[in-house]
């Protein structure tokens, strides 16, 4: 065998070895990618749940004001947005955002509202008892209403009620008609609401002595309806995950 033939044979063996090594490396990479695929899908599923939770939040822009500030070199204009955020199921918050652009002001207002979320006691879509809230010169009265009444309120109060999940209520706004004062007075009223157990514990009485029988019956019916709705939602979610 000549030297040229030997060199050719060695070169062919080297190429075959490199090809085998590359194929094995590709198989390993493919296996790792497949293994990561399951984790990635699970991570995507968790991410979708979080996104769905964020998407379930309701938001209402109550008002957008144009604000100007005078400097030595002239005036600069910005926008202030009053935003209400809630889940429509007893949680609501109000925020205020300022920026030179309207979308940025609304986004800041939404973030500020999410930082000030609080729970609102409800019984079958209405408040637990009459209450009055104040903010500077603004006063807002809230009264329980029968099912089917709807939200009897102005635009500012209605935005708070919708985000809080209150569907039947009678309201009256007095004094200042400024949207900021009206919304803050509404929030002050909602924060004064109490559950019958809290009132009974403070007075040293039983719940039956504090709350009317009709109120307790409506509350029990509301709890049963909410439990049924949660079970149906879980069943739908399980069916979607199974698909």
UniProtKB/Swiss-Prot annotation:
Database matches in SUPFAM superfamilies: dsRNA-binding domain-like, Ribosomal protein S5 domain 2-like
Molecular function per GO: rRNA binding; structural constituent of ribosome
GO biological process, one term: translation
Key words of the record: Ribonucleoprotein, Ribosomal protein, RNA-binding, rRNA-binding
Region (Disordered): 1-54
UniProt record similarity statement: Belongs to the universal ribosomal protein uS5 family.
Protein name per UniProt: Small ribosomal subunit protein uS5
Organism, as annotated: Bifidobacterium animalis subsp. lactis (strain AD011)
Gene: rpsE
